[in-house]
Amino acid sequence: MRAFIVAEIASNWEGSVSVAKKLIKESKKAGADAVKFQMWRASDLYQGHPDWKIIKKSELTFAKVKTLKTYSDKLGIEFFCSGFYPESIEYLQSLGVKRYKLASRTCTLNDPHSLETITKISSYKKPVVISMGMGGNKNKIKKILN
């Protein structure tokens, strides 16, 4: 069995589509099968943070997702995301992503939309990569997904 290699770009693209595209291109050249970004709303997770302007700039909007997904498709590398709110999952679904990722912070069930996001992902019956890096309730997550 061949390993499926994911280039974890997350939010490390400085809010610049050109930087994100360069990272996607380099990931493809390095042999990655997929690139993975994070799709969250700054207002949900970082309200009042001292670095608000920097954080807000790194937010992956629907328009940016579409641009990066189209670019990834053109290069022949899979694009997917950790979606942090239900509408992000719906939008990713409309673009035809093949899989989703549950972020570890979503698995802790402490984010504002954790349960709704997990339920939405489950409804699409696609492969899900689950991160338990921050803990979380493995049994509860399995139950929701099944």
Locate the predicted segments by residue.
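Glycine-rich, proline-tolerant flexible connector loops at the mouths of alpha/beta enzymes
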Residues: D33-L60, L109
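Conserved, mostly hydrophobic/aromatic
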Residues: E8, S27, L92
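Glycine-enriched alpha-helix->loop->beta-strand junction motifs that scaffold or abut catalytic
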Residues: G31, Y91-Y100, S122-V128, N146
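Active-site-adjacent beta->alpha loops and helix N-cap segments on the catalytic face
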Residues: E59-V65, L102-K125, M134-L145
